[in-house]
Swiss-Prot record:
Its EC number is 5.4.2.7. GO terms for cellular component: cytosol. This is Phosphopentomutase. The lineage of its organism: Bacteria, Bacillati, Bacillota, Bacilli, Bacillales. Mn(2+) 2 binds at residues 288, 293, 341. SUPFAM superfamilies: Alkaline phosphatase-like, DeoB insert domain-like.
Amino acid sequence: MPAYKYNRVFLIVMDSVGIGEAPDAADFNDEGAHTLGHIAEHMNGLHMPNMAKLGLGLIEDIKGVEKTEHPLAYYGKMQEASNGKDTMTGHWEIMGLYIDKPFKVFPEGFPDELLQELEKRSGRKIIGNKPASGTAILDELGQEHMETGALIVYTSADSVLQIAAHEEVVPLEELYRICETARELTLDPKYMVGRIIARPFVGEPGQFKRTPNRHDYALKPFDRTVMNELKDCGLDVISIGKISDIYDGEGITSSRRTVSNMDGMDKVIDTLGEDFTGLSFANLVDFDALFGHRRDPEGYGRALEEFDARLPEVFEKMREDDLLIITADHGNDPIHHGTDHTREYVPILAYSKKHKKAQMLPLADTFADIGATIADNFQTNKPKYGKSFLSLLQ
């Protein structure tokens, strides 16, 4: 096996943790957005001593986050090059792919012609058709669904079409078949939906409960990613959280589902104790799903502090030849108008026990610099986009 600078790379994406408006924020109606900064102000200071030690406070002024004189990590920020601010666009770019046309979101619900075709093909009526929290819409429409057999269709601030059905009303196989039909219909460029999600549930009105039989029908990345290159070279690519869904399983050698940020951190810490060579790639979605979209700066702030408190466990289990990269995929400022993501810079922190004198990284004009660096480290084919910063890490 070739000698790699780092035998294992641990990449953690803090979903939606932006660090200030991007230069093109106005094009996305996001002027003034600053996810981390606004949460810190709302909390009258964030308590993130471990991220501070890495150098977070040196990237931007964040209330409560100390500016250390001796950062442990190389630190900086990255600007998104792709034309979009959703999860798939951000993650695909991290691994070397650009999206020219953003995935579509449906804040007013899906077009009638799409739903009429889905009703025709499925033989079932559709109710809902609006952005909603998955649990709230069951409380609202679950009983009607049980009485009529109509499908509950809803969306979120992301590019998703979700179909909820009671397992005793619509058998799982039928629900999955309907979702496959929806996937096929929404490949049409005029819809361009990132993901279709089957959301089965059980229980009685007032006590509905979603089951683990959720199934995602994503789009395959339009081209090869750095993960495909790693896998083809016989390296491990371990997915933690929704990474496998985001890339539709492409380039992944093993996948671990998570139920929360803390479960995600448990899984990261588990992989630190395993022998492998390659990439462990984790997404911590709670920041975005539970707090960003719901415009809950208090909950978001607490989640950031909980994440920070787990980092010493990560540091302790890291080996000399491990590299930890912490970043984000877009912003979702809970103080901002609306409930959508925000077009922001994202932070990047790159830490290894072997680094002697960490310093600031040059401003990256694409998230793909991360993928390029990982490809460079493992001596695989380079992605079309991105510039490796591997040689800067000393």
